[in-house]
Swiss-Prot record:
NCBIfam families, A to Z: cyt_tran_rel (TIGR00125), nicotinate (nicotinamide) nucleotide adenylyltransferase (TIGR00482)
UniProt source species: Leptospira interrogans serogroup Icterohaemorrhagiae serovar copenhageni (strain Fiocruz L1-130)
EC category: transferase
Lineage, opening ranks: Bacteria, Pseudomonadati, Spirochaetota, Spirochaetia, Leptospirales
EC numbers, comma separated: 2.7.7.18
Primary gene name: nadD
Family: Belongs to the NadD family.
Protein's job: Catalyzes the reversible adenylation of nicotinate mononucleotide (NaMN) to nicotinic acid adenine dinucleotide (NaAD).
Catalytic activity entry: nicotinate beta-D-ribonucleotide + ATP + H(+) = deamido-NAD(+) + diphosphate
Name this polypeptide is given: Probable nicotinate-nucleotide adenylyltransferase
Pathway note: Cofactor biosynthesis; NAD(+) biosynthesis; deamido-NAD(+) from nicotinate D-ribonucleotide: step 1/1
Length: 199
């Protein structure tokens, strides 16, 4: 590999960040030791999912608390939060390549996004902009292979632990006045202190 810094891109709502996200990052750093840094990029609005609940400043503060527990280099970028309207991965990748011309990027996506990758804006262009796409497990012990996608590009599959939690589930628990598990104490304390996800 040349002198370019290999950097991961990990996007999502992170509303709130939880132990599932933590295990994905741990597995990624373990399985991809050449990667020296991950950019965690919260989106303002995913075009294929429901609109977010929390304010951008709350998301960023929760993420700062979340990544403070890692020894590896993880940087939070707010470029998608600053956009109006939906966030598109192709825009983000191209913007990052302009800002960081000496880096090579790999993308982390969930198995659900892998299944729907053909629905992403300019998905074929994304394949030309990153080195590799790593798919993490969310629900399946073994991610069903998309033969067509894998004939076009190298998708690699992480062996991350399956953590039965989503940000949507956590928000529902808070709305029902239940304090959920699978969320770090720092993030939980922040949520309770600031009355996020309360009725």
């Amino acid at each position: 590999m040349n002198s370019s810094i290999l950097t991961g891109i990990f996007g999502g709502s992170f509303d709130p960040p939880h132990e599932g996200h933590s295990e994905i990052l741990k597995s990624f750093f373990l399985e991809v030791p050449d990667c020296k840094e991950v950019f965690v990029i919260p989106n303002r609005q995913n075009p294929l999912k429901e609109e977010k609940i929390s304010l951008s400043e709350n998301i960023l503060e929760m993420l700062n608390l979340f990544v403070s527990e890692f020894s590896q280099s993880i940087r939070i970028l707010d470029l998608e939060l600053k956009r109006s309207g939906p966030s598109y991965t192709i825009q983000t990748i191209q913007e990052l390549k302009t800002i960081y011309p000496n880096r090579k990027f790999v993308l982390l996506i969930g198995e659900d996004n892998y299944s729907n990758f053909h629905k992403w804006k300019d998905w074929e262009k994304i394949l030309t902009e990153v080195e590799t796409i790593f798919v993490f497990r969310r629900f399946s012990k073994e991610v069903p292979l998309n033969s067509h996608l894998n004939s076009l590009f190298e998708f690699k599959f992480l062996e991350n632990p399956l953590i039965p939690v989503t940000s949507t589930d956590l928000r529902k628990s808070f709305f029902q006045s239940k304090v959920p598990n699978l969320i770090s104490k720092k993030v939980l304390d922040y949520i309770l202190k600031n009355k996020l996800y309360s009725k």
